[in-house]
A protein has these predicted regions:
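Short amphipathic, positively biased membrane-proximal segments
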Residues: 1-148
Length: 148
């Protein structure tokens, strides 16, 4: 792992980090109604969240998004670490998509009209997995270049 992110990782880190940071900052200002909406949606897919008060859930989600977005934007956070966080976050969003009724077409993984906003988050999972494997790919490439 390197101290600073590789230049080739920065575009995906800036795009995803800026998007997630903005989302988190918006949620920091969530009123009771918005907190209840976020909580209701999430606890429908993840029932264990039902025991968490809506305001606490919204605040925790906001702080998590701000932290992840910031980590993605800071070049001294290793890409593998930032990628692991992004992949986990995106996996949670895709879990919402898969578990929430009405998000997918009947008998299909294809999104319904209501599911498109969540289904599109698959790009963040791909970005996270790419960052997670980036250092390993670079190490192999560098080793091959030295050997031959």
């Amino acid at each position: 792992m390197t101290v600073f992110s590789a230049l080739e990782d920065l575009p995906v880190r800036i795009a995803t980090g800026g998007f997630i940071l903005s989302s988190g900052l918006d949620k920091l200002e969530a009123d009771k109604e918005r907190a209840a909406g976020l909580h209701g949606f999430a606890s429908g897919a993840y029932p264990f969240l039902g025991s968490v008060p809506p305001e606490r859930f919204a605040k925790a989600l906001a702080v998590s998004e701000v932290g992840l977005g910031t980590a993605l934007l800071l070049p001294f956070v290793p890409s593998r670490l930032a990628g692991a966080g992004l992949a986990a976050f995106a996996g949670g969003l895709l879990g919402l998509y898969l578990r929430t009724p009405g998000m997918r077409r009947e008998g299909s993984l294809r999104p319904s009209e209501q599911g498109i906003p969540l289904a599109k988050d698959v790009w963040m999972l791909g970005a996270g997995l790419s960052l997670l494997t980036a250092d390993r790919r670079r190490t192999r490439r560098n080793r091959r270049n030295r050997e031959g």
